[in-house]
Amino acid sequence: MSERWALAPVEGGGALLVPLGPEGLPAGEVRREGDLVGAVRSRPEVGRWVWRSTAEIYPRLLAAGVRVERCYDVEDAELLLLGHEGRLGEPRSAAAAWARLRQAPVPPDPPPRAAEPGSQSSLFEPEPVSVPFEGLLAVYADQQRRHEGTEHPGRMRLLTAAESAGMLVAAEMNRVGLPWRADVHREVLHELLGERYAGGGEPRRLAELADEVSTAFGRRVRPDLPTDVVKAFAQAGIKVRSTRRWELEEIDHPAVRPLIAYKKLYRIWTAHGWGWLQDWVREGRFRPEYLPGGTVSGRWTTNGGGALQIPKVIRRAVVADDGWRLVVADADQMEPRVLAAISRDPGLMEVAGHDGDLYTRLSDRAFSGDRDHAKIALLGAIYGQTSGDGLKNLAALRRRFPLAVAYVDDAARAGEEGRLVRTWLGRTSPRAAGGGDDDEAGIPQEAPGEGPAVEGRGEFAPGYASTDARARGRFTRNFVVQGSAADWALLMLAALRRATADMRAELVFFQHDEVIVHCPADEADEVVRAIRSAGELAGRIAFGETPVRFPFTTAVVERYSDAK
């Protein structure tokens, strides 16, 4: 399966296709066939299909029962190459790339498509600017040349292949869907929120909590409006900057308890309530549209549906089919292990070379057995907590693991100076002058120790678009680690997809460091082994031969909520 063919759909359901040579140029005559699906199905020897967009073609193949082993997504490759060239933000469509080759006016990318609950993604894509087949071939050949001109061509080609594999996984997960029991979901909502009132108003429990908040303030207050809450506290002589839970918990006022409870339930009602259930769950499956590389760091996002923010209590509705199981796997302390691999720090690689708790081993090496201090120090180095206790802990970390700390320090310095940084495989940060929504950066925006409990999951503000040098440095410090972890995750998914190809098992969910496989009960043990093997294989492929291990904590359950 070493052949590589280019493929493009044409009107009437047909296709243009041609074999490609080693340089990316056509190695034969262009053929026109009347059935795109049949053209792919009849060529099982093709090792990689080159096409404009996976979202444009692959759902159609999957609907016909055709699965491809590998692909090359031209538009995704264009995005990665533009980023490497410091041009992130320029149009990344095949039509735009073709226009640049001809020095013609470059068309803008189509606007993002609104989420269509329960739909197959390609059916609702905005109409792209057309590009002739010869244009697609020219863009692909040019991309092969541009790969050769990158800082590490082999790594960059690997990243492109891995991201294209991620596109296949995303389309397959959308097709299969996450098992979802609507009846269980409704039971959970009734248990949490109480009865629904006619007219779409707040359910009973939210209304009760809202009344408690108002009673505590002595006047009518809308707990769903942060400005109203902040104003009410101010009138009570209490200054608050926001209504975030960690800030409210510091306040001694009778409104705090019902307000926190209200906010938690309100979030469930609006994000995963009855309306969400009606829109997004069809025939026992939740089918979000996954967007690989949806953030600049390479982490995935979804187009609507809130798949990556499913509350634990709602996970009770994620139930395996009869006779099947959910294999839920979490990568253990993934980002610290990735830092060990990319920094090549001998001491940290030795710590990360075992399957056990990394922070415990770290504490034994440098923090007199104090696991909490070890964790704060390492996450502080990654996320930029370099003051107060974080500075003291960082000094201890720097003495024992100088290469690891220097790696992220150098990345931070580059960001402060307005320079670009790259992940291990070559994904490149945006320029400091770029714009964008900080929440889309995939980078935490709350430093460890400055807000909620340290988990490396808060959020820094601003972000990569900031004109503040220190904020930019915090972004790039984390980018090189989080982005490299996202690269590893792509390779893990590709390896797992390949390992389960001959099973009935289905990849049904992925976020950051967690994967769920839905499989017959008698395949569960084999799936667990496949996940663990995929993690180790991805580590070797991404980072070479290092002592670093990439273990998973796995649980075989009937219900997602039982895994945590």
Which residues does each predicted region cover?
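Conserved "right-hand" nucleotidyltransferase catalytic core of DNA-directed polymerases
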Residues: 1-25, 119-125, 129-310, 323-325, ...
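Short amphipathic alpha-helix segments
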Residues: 481-501
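A structural signal for short secondary-structure junctions
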Residues: 319-321, 489, 500-503, 508-512, ...
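Polymerase palm active-site segment centered on the conserved acidic dipeptide of motif C
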Residues: 53-54, 58, 189-222, 401, ...
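Helical catalytic core of nucleic-acid polymerases
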Residues: 74-153, 167-168, 172-174, 197, ...
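Hydrophobic, well-ordered secondary-structure elements that form the walls
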Residues: 298, 330, 489, 496, ...
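Conserved RNase H-like, two-metal-ion catalytic cores of nucleic-acid enzymes
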Residues: 1-92
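Short beta-strand-to-loop capping motifs
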Residues: 517-521
